[in-house]
Amino acid sequence: MIISEKVKKALEDGIPVIALESTVIAHGLPYPHNVETAKMLEEMALENGVVPATIGILKGEIIVGMSQEQINEMLADEPLKIGTREIPYAVGMKKSAATTVSATMRIAKIAGIDVFATGGIGGVHIGDWDVSQDITEMAKSDVIVVSAGCKSILDVKKTIEFLETFQVTVVGYKTNKFPIFYEGLSDFNLEHRVDSPEDIAKIFRAKKSLGIEGALLVANPIPQEFVISEQEVDGYMKQALSECFEKGITGKAVTPYLLSRIAQLSNGKTLTSNIELLKNNVLLACQIAKSLKTMA
């Protein structure tokens, strides 16, 4: 594993660090929005006094704190999309790979990074037993995951049930409802709500001090002005899902296909919302990372 000098120095000097995934760059957003957004999110973190650490794998080397040149090289290498279980394959076979939520969490934990910002977590897909590694990894890795809930292409109720089954601590940030990506808030209640980054830091500290393993999932809704109605998203979703099944797309290829197709069908509306919720999550992650340091 290679930890960049900037990230290594920040960790040694007690400067707040947040992890960022590379899948959003390689498979989550179309070019050139992917590269532009990745750069913008890193700049946001730096402006808030936090060092960003984009995580990915380049020709078999795990890199924590990818440079722009390394990101470009990874993209040019047609990277795999990997979860935790595929990390050994990518490393052993010297492949380039973009890390999903699960893989990014595991690598962040190994590197000593406590906070990770993403768009939305994976979960239980509609109509079958396709369950994301994100959930099982959250049962193991002691990392704060800031996300806009789960993606609306999933079975939200079953995803919430699986999070409970795997004993993942979930808190809503300034909300009592579980958020669902572009659509804002779902109808599903959350048991626990917090209203400050400091409270999130307190919960995480308590979790670690008690030796209770696993992530703290912070459900942070998309800002209201960028919410897209359930009815509108459902229309795009039904068409995209139908095309997905017709094309025989399965597994990890499903989510990037659906997100890309829905962006096309919405004339870029979902793309704008996706970028805004990422910015919102990075900002909160920065506040949490700083709160953890002031408590230390």
Swiss-Prot record:
GO terms (BP aspect): nucleobase catabolic process
Family: Belongs to the pseudouridine-5'-phosphate glycosidase family.
GO CC terms of this entry: cytoplasm
Gene Ontology MF terms: hydrolase activity, acting on glycosyl bonds; metal ion binding; pseudouridylate synthase activity
InterPro entries: Indigdn_synthA-like (IPR022830), PsuG (IPR007342)
Name of the encoding gene: psuG
Superkingdom, taxonomy of origin: Bacteria
Sites where the protein binds substrate: 81, 101, 132-134
Catalyses which reaction(s): D-ribose 5-phosphate + uracil = psi-UMP + H2O
Annotated S-S bridges: none
Record EC number: 4.2.1.70
Key word Lyase present: yes
Organism this protein belongs to: Fervidobacterium nodosum (strain ATCC 35602 / DSM 5306 / Rt17-B1)
Name of the protein described by the UniProt record: Pseudouridine-5'-phosphate glycosidase
Coiled coil: none
Cofactor section: Mn(2+)
Keyword Lyase: yes
Active site location: 21 (proton donor), 151 (nucleophile)
Record SUPFAM superfamilies: Indigoidine synthase A-like (SSF110581)
